[in-house]
Amino acid sequence: MARNGNPQFPDERSTATRAKATEPEELDDRFSDLEPEEDSPFLRSQKRVPVRRGPLPSKKAANRVKIALIVLGVLVVIGGVWMALSAYGEHSWRFRLESSDSIEVGGNEHMSRGEITRVFGGDISRNIFAVPLDERKKQVEELPWVESATVMRILPDRIRVQVTERKPVAFAQIGSRVQLIDAHGVLMEMPFSTTNKYSFPVISGMHENEPLSTRSARMKIYQELVKELDASGEHNSKSLSEVDVSDPDDVKVTVEDADGAVLVHLGSQNFADRFHLYVTHLKEWRSQYQHLDSVDLRYDRQVILNPDSHPSAAKPTAPAVAPAVEKPAVAKPAVAKPTAHTSGRRH
């Protein structure tokens, strides 16, 4: 037999043998340490791992969630019902505007019913929900006599129009025509039929093509004149047959009585005081002039009689009324008709 060339000593062999014998024992001891010793009274208890838990919803919060869900469900149901009703209303024949008889009109005293229903001519045989109420309202308010209007649907197949008409305050001479005019300068044709009998002065000095803003400014002058003349309660404005507002700096009024018509220049202020001066001295002036056509009261210290007449027909004013004696040719003439006004009668 071949021998190992490396010699082994007795101690080395015994050491190797003991090492092999102890290896399984050491492994067994290691695994045995992993097993819990249930019977050991000194066994340390295992540490519990903390578990984080969120707060549970309270009973009130749960009730709120339920209520919110119920409300949401009710809203969904209502929305569905509304959509169904809307679809039915938009397509059902029951909501059709059959004729102009289905249009109710109220508040029209000076306008005919047909003037208003003509605005809805294109809506006949249409569904009332397809009628643009706001647009029709604007169209109705564009009618001269209408100041404001309301348009509403009346289920199932009617429309109601309620109008508020303008209130005329005077007649306006526009070219060869005489129309009614309100406080804002809006011109209106004579009503087709009315039980009201108007007694207004005629306002001259307006033109058909001038903008509404210009007429509105002229009407403010007229209203201020009437307000001052009637402030004392004597209603002096009723004695006016014509008011010329063509010149804002010289408002001219025609006063007509049994002895004739007189054109009075009132200027742009102190209308009441100047008119009172005219009424107080009218008889005196007429006693001095056989034909008193006009009186100029624009100047504080003088009164000019017949300033619109020819100079040859003028005479000096009474010294008691006008200390500074003036003749019409000397005073600044005002633009007015040269003869007495008989055409501007109260209508």
UniProtKB/Swiss-Prot annotation:
Signal sequence span is none
Q: How does it sit in the membrane?
A: Single-pass type II membrane protein
Q: Name one GO cellular component term.
A: plasma membrane
Pfam families (alphabetical): FtsQ_DivIB_C, POTRA_1
Instruction: Set out the biological process GO terms recorded for this chain's protein.
Output: cell septum assembly; FtsZ-dependent cytokinesis
Q: Which domain of life is it from?
A: Bacteria
InterPro entries for this protein:
Cell_div_FtsQ/DivIB_C (IPR005548), FtsQ (IPR026579), FtsQ_C_sf (IPR045335), POTRA (IPR034746), POTRA_FtsQ_type (IPR013685)
Location of this chain's protein in the cell: Cell inner membrane
Chain segments annotated as transmembrane: 67-87
Coiled coil as a keyword? no
Chief localization: membrane
UniProt lists compositionally biased (Low complexity) regions at: 313-340
PANTHER family (UniProt xref) = CELL DIVISION PROTEIN FTSQ (PTHR35851:SF1)
Provide the family line.
Answer: Belongs to the FtsQ/DivIB family. FtsQ subfamily.
Protein name per the record: Cell division protein FtsQ
